[in-house]
Amino acid sequence: MKKVLLYGDSNTWGHNPVDFTQLPRTWGNVAQELLPECEITIDGECGRATLWGEGPKHGIACFRERYFVKKHDFDLIAIMLGTNDLLKQLQYKPERTAQALRQYIHETRVVYGDKTPEFLIISPIHVNDNVLKHPVFSELYSPKSVEDSKRLAEAISKMAADEDVYFMNAADFAKASDIDGVHMVTEEHESSA
């Protein structure tokens, strides 16, 4: 049985844009249904950025703690991060996000050596203009966040090609809801799987 890790943020966790609860069906759950021959571990946390974040469950430090201290036998690690890098408090440029994702790949290769899993790096969906009207997220994201979200795929795909890893652009399959401009509704999770 193939083992897959999905490592991401609130769109991997399944943040419901309507009421902030967890959606019962996420792209990870749908992937598990579509790939019963795979054992899929879903590790999504709200607010997770590539390098830093609030709390112990965020950034690359969390990845190291969970997947380097005790080695796992994953065949594939899929990482979808970058949306929280666009927060006003961080404002990473797309190129910095791509470099941070490169760090995940490099460090995993050092730790796992010849048992390094394959990587699938997923550029997240675009943040849309509705985020600027949302009562909560308008305080966290800016017009620059919306624009930079559209540039993530180019920077991340270039890095993925340089590192010879798989790449997918989630924005080709799904979009953020018009409710909050950041998170997917169930139908978009189903489309992105």
What are these regions (language model features)?
Residues 42-44, 123, 169-171:
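Residue-level recognition of beta-strand->loop/alpha-helix junctions
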Residues 128-169:
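Substrate-gating cap/lid alpha-helix
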Residues 109-118:
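A short helix->loop->beta-strand "cap" motif at the edges of active sites that frequently abuts
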